[in-house]
Amino acid sequence: MIIHWQYKPWKHFEVRDFLTSEELTEARTYFDTLSMPDGVTGDTERKRNRHTLHILPEMPKDSFTAKVVERFKELCSIVSTYSDEEDDIQLEYDRMYPGWSWHIHQDDSVKKLSFIVHISEKGHGTKLYHREDGMGFKREVTWSPGGGGGFICKEGTYHSWDTKKDDTIRKTILITKLQKRKIVVENER
């Protein structure tokens, strides 16, 4: 695992080789078992364009997910901290249809650290913004299959993502370090 810190528009990090090549193949095989959005099916725009499998802290973990959780704890110990007594880990296996986007936002206050693992071969990384309105310095995290980008959640960490330039489903694993016994429930915005 190779970590590169970046400081604009705010402090964040990019990781290469979070997953080994064998683990990336295993992840892609796992994703092949999950539903894929088609841009049509679903009763909301979000459900038509984004499918998410939530793995909450108290849920049992399959062997691949357990491996990802342990690797994330290792990453946390390098870029921040991790304590089983104070922190929980939540995962989201995300699949996003081409041409879709999510609004600029800051993460929920119970999130301490977010890391997005890039699974698909092609894609575009998380977009980082200096301001909530998208003005000022912007940066896109480099897409790195088996790697990804992350940040310590705090005031001013505005970000978004989209699949506007993609022609394939964007597959990622969002891993979040949370305050103990808190879960994040997303809205349909």
For every predicted segment, state its role.
Residues I2-Y82:
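Non-heme Fe(II)/2-oxoglutarate
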Residues K73, S77-E188:
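Catalytic core of non-heme Fe(II) oxygenases with the double-stranded beta-helix
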